[in-house]
Amino acid sequence: MTNIRKQHPLAKMINHSFIDLPAPSNISSWWNFGSLLGLCLMIQIITGLFLAMHYSSDTSTAFSSVTHICRDVNYGWIIRYLHANGASMFFICLFTHIGRGLYYGSFTFLETWNIGIILLFTVMATAFMGYVLPWGQMSFWGATVITNLLSAIPYMGTGLVEWIWGGFSVDKATLTRFFAFHFILPFIIAALAMIHLLFLHETGSNNPSGISSDSDKIPFHPYYTIKDLLGAILLLLSLFSLVLFSPDLLGDPDNYIPANPLNTPPHIKPEWYFLFAYAILRSIPNKLGGVLALVSSILILALIPYLHTAKQRSMMFRPLSQCLYWMLVADLFTLTWIGGQPVENPFITIGQTASIIYFLIVLILMPLTNLLENKLLKW
């Protein structure tokens, strides 16, 4: 058995990635989220495949086909809610994974970090297009509002929006192409995740201390396979609790109303995992400025490695940076809350303040605090 594992070309690859992989002996539970993201992706692909068997991507039947899945298909309701809430779990793991990378300085692995940013954008695009498919009120108006943002691009904006729509409004052509893209993108995400892992295994994992762990490595199996299994059980427990007890907790009631282009919902808002970016978008009165701020709020991650002025890699021994980090987390929670509120005072002011604080912490305060800590440590 050992010989097959170490000699067969395919088994050898799996062995080097998941069995005999040398891993740092001190990585904490924050390192579980990479494998949990893999699990989430598998859940989404499997449930999505079964949903696609019964879904109809036509404007006249899309809403009815989702209703049919929930009412008439065997266990269709659980497949549908696993898929919808699986997306929420996916983003919880994704944000935690990025947060871990920021806290412990994993962004110094440049290729891995940059592939991760591409993955984030791809997952966000996939989730957005998936939200349009049930063709409820929020699906239709969410698609209209978000795609319309591209019209802010000078000269070519309007043409670009109509090209994406496949007409002069969000209609049958839009729904059909969104379904096609929503189906193919998860497989592209899986391929990107493999490239992400490939680059990670070139350098080896980071660890909480941020210093090289070459002198103290342990095999991935059985130590971290068991640890990842525990994480997977807890994730599945949370997901099934959500699906079986309150499946609509994170959804919008407006999406149970079939799409009607003649009736605008009072508050158009995306799913909760996009609310922080939506709040930043709304906090700027100018359309182009808002779109630039929205893109910058995520693209700013690409600047993090270049803004890292600290001599120490991890924040583990840097209390001032830790304070700023948790302020940033609190700020993102505030933005998420504001994104779901109506556009009126005091929410407008809170949103604008939180948006300024977000960019201020990342672009100015963090690098300055790093330099101050270097000085305090006489480095």
Swiss-Prot record:
Binding site for heme b b566: H97, H196
UniProt xrefs under Gene3D superfamilies: Cytochrome Bc1 Complex, Chain C
Cofactor info, note text: Binds 2 heme b groups non-covalently.
GO cellular component terms, A-Z: mitochondrial inner membrane; respiratory chain complex III
Protein residues bound to heme b b562: H83, H182
Binding site for a ubiquinone: H201
Compartments where located: Mitochondrion inner membrane
Membrane topology: Multi-pass membrane protein
Keyword tags: Electron transport, Heme, Iron, Membrane, Metal-binding, Mitochondrion, Mitochondrion inner membrane, Respiratory chain, Transmembrane, Transmembrane helix, Transport, Ubiquinone
Cofactors: heme b
Membrane spanning residue stretches: 33-53, 77-98, 113-133, 178-198, 226-246, 288-308, 320-340, 347-367
Gene Ontology molecular function, alphabetical: metal ion binding; ubiquinol-cytochrome-c reductase activity
InterPro entries attached to this UniProt entry: Cyt_b/b6_C, Cyt_b/b6_C_sf, Cyt_b/b6_N, Cytb/b6-like_sf, Cytochrome_b, Cytochrome_b_C_euk/bac, Cytochrome_b_N_euk/bac, Di-haem_cyt_TM
A GO BP entry: mitochondrial electron transport, ubiquinol to cytochrome c
Pfam families in the cross-refs: Cytochrom_B_C, Cytochrome_B
Quaternary structure (record): The cytochrome bc1 complex contains 11 subunits: 3 respiratory subunits (MT-CYB, CYC1 and UQCRFS1), 2 core proteins (UQCRC1 and UQCRC2) and 6 low-molecular weight proteins (UQCRH/QCR6, UQCRB/QCR7, UQCRQ/QCR8, UQCR10/QCR9, UQCR11/QCR10 and a cleavage product of UQCRFS1). This cytochrome bc1 complex then forms a dimer.
Further comment: Heme 1 (or BL or b562) is low-potential and absorbs at about 562 nm, and heme 2 (or BH or b566) is high-potential and absorbs at about 566 nm.
Function per UniProt: Component of the ubiquinol-cytochrome c reductase complex (complex III or cytochrome b-c1 complex) that is part of the mitochondrial respiratory chain. The b-c1 complex mediates electron transfer from ubiquinol to cytochrome c. Contributes to the generation of a proton gradient across the mitochondrial membrane that is then used for ATP synthesis.
Family the UniProt entry places it in: Belongs to the cytochrome b family.
Protein name, UniProt field: Cytochrome b
Organism expressing this protein natively: Galago moholi
